[in-house]
């Protein structure tokens, strides 16, 4: 960790010094200096080099004051000056500056949330523990809300969320969002609750993060067009205006309801991940009749949420229906609820998929293993991992090795997380220098989760796993920093919702191997690795 911290500090210092060399003292030059300067100060402070932290904090504050004199007032200038004062231990001036920043016209909720996170990190390192509480009071919460709920009723079913209930439901959503102070929303985009929530969040000027379980066109057929009317155009509109759109998989539905469950888990995980980064508990808003429901439904989601967080904010549709008793039903123009791409029997037209976690590992400097030490390497690498596999509570779904590489598929994410960190520690803390002609033997480990195809492999004579999500896990592995575990954003989200023993750091939006594309990648750690007290 400290090795990568040194690299980050050096990068910010290089950026700051480069701007200093080019500076002519003009406003546009100063505006390029304060950001790398305060980041160097923050990094030095976090890694306990107070002298350098103070040096850069003073420089950053002076740059901000010069910018202000030249008429360059902005939220970030004010927030940077506040952070510099806090690093310097000047708590009173820092709190005053933070309050001024939060009240500025260009203070967007996402800006304030980011500033709050960094301020709390600094405050947690100050000897006087009351300072953190004072800093918390200087900022409003972001108001993170995940939402789910019933879709508009299919024609002919018992009334639960009929089309004519839409306006009353929207009013109740507006009231709930006011109560929760919502500025950041997470939801899928089915007709009914989801789209109403996303539209209302957009009207409030909030962020909207949309999650779809599979390909867009098939989602429209399963979960939007069924309601008739203008729901499809409204679906397109909320996606067009969304802050982000995430797909659990870009493939089709194929009658696989487990994708709805995974989508719920990922969506709640993203909300939890946002709250985790900001030291803020997210909230859940649902339109729900209190019944368990089907796979991937609202009842399943509420049960999972209650196991991890607070009580959800529930809008009961049964309380809406009495107000509609004298209303004329709104006509529904589409009675077709069965997706055209499913067979009459309801079976998938494709092979069976299942949700799995994939782990790839290989050893850096394997080519430097001395020939006469090959048998010893096999005992260390294969033998060591074999013992770890025996200690797992469940047998993996699949294991394969070739040379210095290792591939394993898990039914349970917990098993993959446990094994990944055990392998990492086994290599990081072992003494393997005698095996190599030169270099250091370190392991690279990658993980991803998603729906994969399970097929009989005629070469291995046993079942094997295939598909894009297997490929994605494999393409992460070559870019892993030696001695580390890199995981996909999906895994990071799942960790955030229900895996309290694990943590992660954002590594960046990285280009994966073999032109697979750029993806957000995270470095897996155990909870408390940074000195943070575990609850």
Give residue ranges: language-model regions.
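Catalytic NTP-binding/metal-coordinating core of nucleotidyl cyclase/transferase enzymes
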Residues: 345-426
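TPR/TPR-like (Sel1-like) alpha-helical repeat modules
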Residues: 58-62, 91-109
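Regulatory cytosolic signal-relay segments
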Residues: 321-354, 379
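Boundary/linker segments of alpha-helical solenoid repeat arrays
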Residues: 22-24, 28-30, 64-73, 105-117
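Catalytic beta-strand-to-alpha-helix segment of the class III nucleotidyl cyclase homology domain
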Residues: 408-531
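Acidic/glycine-enriched connector segments
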Residues: 1-64, 140-331
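"A position-specific structural signal for the A-helix of alpha-solenoid helical repeats
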Residues: 39, 80-87, 117-118
């Amino acid at each position: 960790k400290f090795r990568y911290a040194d690299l980050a500090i050096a990068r910010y210092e290089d950026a700051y010094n480069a701007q200093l060399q080019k500076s002519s003292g003009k406003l546009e030059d100063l505006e390029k200096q304060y950001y790398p300067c305060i980041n160097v100060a923050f990094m030095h402070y976090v890694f306990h080099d107070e002298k350098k932290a103070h040096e850069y904090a003073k420089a950053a504050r002076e740059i901000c004051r010069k910018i202000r004199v030249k008429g360059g007032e902005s939220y970030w200038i004010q927030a940077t000056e506040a952070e510099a004062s806090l690093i310097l231990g000047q708590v009173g001036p820092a709190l005053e500056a933070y309050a001024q920043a939060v009240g500025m016209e260009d203070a967007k909720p996402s800006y304030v949330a980011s500033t709050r996170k960094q301020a709390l990190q600094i405050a947690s390192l100050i000897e006087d523990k009351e300072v953190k509480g004072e800093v918390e009071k200087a900022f409003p919460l972001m108001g993170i809300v995940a939402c789910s709920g019933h879709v508009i009723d299919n024609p002919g079913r018992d009334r639960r969320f009929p089309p004519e209930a839409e306006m009353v439901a929207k009013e109740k959503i507006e009231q709930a969002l006011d109560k929760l102070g919502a500025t950041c929303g997470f939801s899928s985009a089915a007709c009914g609750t989801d789209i109403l929530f996303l539209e209302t969040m957009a009207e409030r000027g909030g962020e909207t993060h949309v999650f779809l379980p599979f390909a867009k066109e098939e989602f429209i057929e399963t979960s939007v067009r069924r309601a008739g009317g203008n729901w499809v155009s409204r679906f397109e509109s909320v996606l067009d205006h969304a802050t982000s759109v995430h797909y659990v998989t870009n493939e089709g539905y194929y009658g696989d309801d487990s994708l709805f469950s995974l989508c719920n888990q990922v969506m709640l995980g993203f909300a939890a991940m946002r709250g985790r980064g900001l030291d803020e508990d997210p909230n859940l808003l649902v339109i729900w009749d209190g019944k368990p429901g089907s796979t991937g439904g609202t009842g399943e989601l509420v049960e999972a949420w209650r196991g991890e967080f607070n009580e959800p904010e529930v809008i009961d549709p049964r309380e809406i229906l009495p107000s509609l008793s004298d209303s004329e039903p709104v006509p529904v123009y589409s009675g077709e609820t069965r997706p055209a791409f499913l067979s009459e029997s309801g079976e998938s037209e494709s092979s069976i998929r299942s949700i799995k976690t994939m782990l790839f590992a290989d050893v850096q400097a394997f080519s430097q293993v001395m020939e006469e030490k090959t048998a010893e390497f096999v005992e260390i690498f294969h033998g060591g991992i074999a013992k770890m596999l025996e200690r797992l509570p469940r047998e993996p779904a699949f294991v394969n090795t070739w040379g210095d590489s290792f591939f394993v598929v898990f039914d349970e994410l917990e098993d993959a997380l446990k094994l990944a960190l055990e392998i990492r520690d086994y290599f990081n803390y072992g003494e393997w220098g005698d095996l190599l002609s030169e270099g250091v033997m370190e392991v690279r480990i990658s993980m991803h989760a998603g729906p994969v195809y399970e097929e009989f492999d005629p070469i291995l004579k046993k079942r094997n796993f295939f598909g894009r999500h297997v490929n994605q896990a494999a393409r992460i592995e070559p870019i892993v920093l030696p001695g580390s575990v890199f995981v996909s954003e999906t895994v990071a989200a799942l960790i955030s919702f229900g895996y309290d023993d694990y943590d992660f750091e954002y590594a960046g939006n990285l280009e994966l191997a073999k032109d697979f594309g750029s993806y957000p990648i995270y470095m897996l750690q155990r909870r408390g690795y940074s000195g943070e007290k575990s609850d």
